[in-house]
């Protein structure tokens, strides 16, 4: 067992994390926000990479909301090499698009969110290919978790293995009561490899996460809500998109808020959850400081004084 770090070393690590977060906050400030704006797109336009992943930038009253729709029906939306490549490309573009305010990940295949890794494709891999493939899944899911804007997983169907790990990488999860969710890898004599062993305990607690992973238990929407795995559960509608509609409602609630503040708030929460309270409060202070000099903060105060809705520009 490694020796415990000295108090001074822990202090240095905490101070280093605060400085790192402060630097990240600074990059999210007005100067960075003003750069790299994406060209205006038409109503609910579609960026056609391939049909397996549809990227829609919503418009009009939904401007700023982006929907990633997984559309791989023949593979139950399983994570293939090609789908991972498209997800990676889409996420890479979205993280630097300052017009993006909230991202929703959903399925466009009825009854399925994502069935996990493509096991048929994996069965054809040489043993030397499996490790890098799982590493790619983990990397793409990590990239989703690290997106600077709020992310919502709309689970209207089956979310197993890597599919649930994909949802766990999102800030908020909503599901239909008929949805099925579980980390079932132990049934295949493996373990969750896309972050599930780390994110599930952080979402629902260590003991319950162990129970679910050890048993490979599958939960429905009501059960998932009861253990805190999802934030909202809805009765499925005739169209089969109840979770997506709820996700869209939540995303609309986020739109009026200050864009820089939203990004900095997410950074403060995410980083603060990984450290002790004292360090977390220092991270909050560093993040708050980045909002003070923004034009949006002044606009918020002026709008309050004038009793009107604020007109934030992300500056």
Swiss-Prot record:
<feature type="modified residue" description="N6-acetyllysine; alternate">
    <location>
        <position position="76"/>
    </location>
</feature>
<dbReference type="GO" id="GO:0006635">
    <property type="term" value="P:fatty acid beta-oxidation"/>
</dbReference>
<dbReference type="InterPro" id="IPR014748">
    <property type="entry name" value="Enoyl-CoA_hydra_C"/>
</dbReference>
<dbReference type="GO" id="GO:0003730">
    <property type="term" value="F:mRNA 3'-UTR binding"/>
</dbReference>
<feature type="modified residue" description="N6-succinyllysine; alternate">
    <location>
        <position position="120"/>
    </location>
</feature>
<feature type="modified residue" description="N6-succinyllysine; alternate">
    <location>
        <position position="89"/>
    </location>
</feature>
<feature type="modified residue" description="N6-succinyllysine">
    <location>
        <position position="124"/>
    </location>
</feature>
<feature type="modified residue" description="N6-succinyllysine">
    <location>
        <position position="85"/>
    </location>
</feature>
<feature type="modified residue" description="N6-succinyllysine; alternate">
    <location>
        <position position="76"/>
    </location>
</feature>
<protein>
    <recommendedName>
        <fullName>Methylglutaconyl-CoA hydratase, mitochondrial</fullName>
        <ecNumber>4.2.1.18</ecNumber>
        <ecNumber>4.2.1.56</ecNumber>
    </recommendedName>
</protein>
<keyword id="KW-0496">Mitochondrion</keyword>
<comment type="function">
    <text>Catalyzes the fifth step in the leucine degradation pathway, the reversible hydration of 3-methylglutaconyl-CoA (3-MG-CoA) to 3-hydroxy-3-methylglutaryl-CoA (HMG-CoA). Can catalyze the reverse reaction but at a much lower rate in vitro. HMG-CoA is then quickly degraded by another enzyme (such as HMG-CoA lyase) to give acetyl-CoA and acetoacetate.</text>
</comment>
<keyword id="KW-0809">Transit peptide</keyword>
<feature type="modified residue" description="N6-succinyllysine; alternate">
    <location>
        <position position="180"/>
    </location>
</feature>
<feature type="modified residue" description="N6-acetyllysine; alternate">
    <location>
        <position position="120"/>
    </location>
</feature>
<feature type="transit peptide" description="Mitochondrion">
    <location>
        <begin position="1"/>
        <end position="43"/>
    </location>
</feature>
<dbReference type="GO" id="GO:0006552">
    <property type="term" value="P:L-leucine catabolic process"/>
</dbReference>
<dbReference type="GO" id="GO:0004490">
    <property type="term" value="F:methylglutaconyl-CoA hydratase activity"/>
</dbReference>
<dbReference type="Pfam" id="PF00378">
    <property type="entry name" value="ECH_1"/>
</dbReference>
<feature type="modified residue" description="N6-succinyllysine">
    <location>
        <position position="136"/>
    </location>
</feature>
<comment type="similarity">
    <text>Belongs to the enoyl-CoA hydratase/isomerase family.</text>
</comment>
<dbReference type="GO" id="GO:0003723">
    <property type="term" value="F:RNA binding"/>
</dbReference>
<keyword id="KW-0456">Lyase</keyword>
<feature type="modified residue" description="N6-acetyllysine; alternate">
    <location>
        <position position="89"/>
    </location>
</feature>
<comment type="subunit">
    <text>Homohexamer.</text>
</comment>
<keyword id="KW-0101">Branched-chain amino acid catabolism</keyword>
<feature type="modified residue" description="N6-succinyllysine">
    <location>
        <position position="305"/>
    </location>
</feature>
<feature type="modified residue" description="N6-succinyllysine; alternate">
    <location>
        <position position="187"/>
    </location>
</feature>
<feature type="modified residue" description="N6-acetyllysine; alternate">
    <location>
        <position position="180"/>
    </location>
</feature>
<dbReference type="GO" id="GO:0004300">
    <property type="term" value="F:enoyl-CoA hydratase activity"/>
</dbReference>
<dbReference type="GO" id="GO:0005739">
    <property type="term" value="C:mitochondrion"/>
</dbReference>
<keyword id="KW-0694">RNA-binding</keyword>
<keyword id="KW-0007">Acetylation</keyword>
<feature type="region of interest" description="RNA-binding">
    <location>
        <begin position="81"/>
        <end position="95"/>
    </location>
</feature>
<dbReference type="InterPro" id="IPR029045">
    <property type="entry name" value="ClpP/crotonase-like_dom_sf"/>
</dbReference>
<dbReference type="InterPro" id="IPR001753">
    <property type="entry name" value="Enoyl-CoA_hydra/iso"/>
</dbReference>
<comment type="pathway">
    <text>Amino-acid degradation; L-leucine degradation; (S)-3-hydroxy-3-methylglutaryl-CoA from 3-isovaleryl-CoA: step 3/3.</text>
</comment>
<dbReference type="InterPro" id="IPR018376">
    <property type="entry name" value="Enoyl-CoA_hyd/isom_CS"/>
</dbReference>
<feature type="modified residue" description="N6-acetyllysine; alternate">
    <location>
        <position position="187"/>
    </location>
</feature>
<dbReference type="GO" id="GO:0050011">
    <property type="term" value="F:itaconyl-CoA hydratase activity"/>
</dbReference>
